Amino acid sequence: MTASPRPAEFSPADLAPIVGALRAAGCVFAEEEARLLASSARTPADLTALVTRRVAGLPLEQVLGWAEFCGQRIAVDPGVFVPRRRTEYLARVAIMLGWQAARPGEPVVVLDLCCGTAAVGAAVAAALDHAELHAADVDPAAVRCARRNVAAADGQVYEGDLYDPLPGTLRGRVDVLAANVPYIPAGEIALLPPEARLHEPRVALDGGADGLDLLRRVAAAAPQWLAPGGSLLSEVSERQAAAARRAVAASGLGTRVTSSSDMDATVIVGTRYGTLHR
């Protein structure tokens, strides 16, 4: 068996011009980025290619091919939505709900909707003793990436619009439905940093006129898919919280808002009334 090439070793002097180039391109954490890029390069030519892509404006995670999320290394392909650090809070809330739903000898059924890389689903499944993981996204590139990220959990990933591609056997069985829907108002897309605006799919960013179009669609059908006692949870901005809560409540779910000031994250939780029985 042929051993994989080892990363090249670069001295501080080698990295100095790279730090300068990254800083000139507007990278705030240029030193850290230079170290990460160097650790991913097999040869000096590789490093040059990586730096060129980063300086051109590609998100660091797409250049590296991975992002750290909840302590896991999540594969991120070019053109795929990059999991945000604030979304770790959504994953943590989902994990807590998964623990509460756990029953001896039975899996916690987890659905990661609008999954992107499936970072949330992968993190939740990794934290639970026994999870049955499903994920779905409309973007084919995201689906390919997600399948790699959930392989360790034996997760299933489906391609299609929201619930459309899901197997009917999931209806009424989902304990934790994490929907990381796009929630940026359409009129604010142009204000996003170029990294997101130019290199991530608009379908993963654009939430319609007020940013809540997708959440309304997800919430409207959620009761059909949730198990009794199961919960839908979704990330929104703080200023959208009241309207988002009304949208989820309109589907008949009991609602609450939870937030983390440290992570600048707001999550809407909607729970299907009833006792969890299987």
PLM features per residue range, with description:
Residues 22, 98, 150, 222, ...:
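Conserved hydrophobic residues forming the short capping helix/wall of the S-adenosyl-L-methionine
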Residues 2, 28-97:
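Conserved AdoMet
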Residues 181-214:
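Mobile active-site "lid"/loop adjacent to the S-adenosyl-L-methionine
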Residues 89-191:
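Conserved SAM/SAH cofactor-binding pocket of Class I
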Residues 273-278:
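Flexible, glycine-/basic-rich loop-and-beta segments that form/coincide
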